[in-house]
């Protein structure tokens, strides 16, 4: 049985999802970048509802919008940068991802979300494995809708 090779993509977008940049295949366009995992990608944020408690009643008034709106969720994206040019690739990826809004999707889940980078970016570990040096970096991404959607090809 052949091993399944998943692909991981990002694209610069406006907040409404309109593309403003080229699609980047992360492991092709950033030579030496290796995807590890995206923790929290399947999480759904808390639904926003309005509740009103009235002193004279044991009932509670609740307003639930027809179109659900969710709190933003955080996704931890863990990447490795390997090889001789690992710092160049790390810096090029940071230049790409740290400004504005970016859409992420992959061929494993076929789900997409729009995010911005919230917290500082720093190298978790600089490790040497055999003769191939690599950097491990965790990125904290804020999913602006609080959920993922089916990727539209």
What are these regions (language model features)?
Residues 2-153:
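Extracellular/virion structural assembly segments
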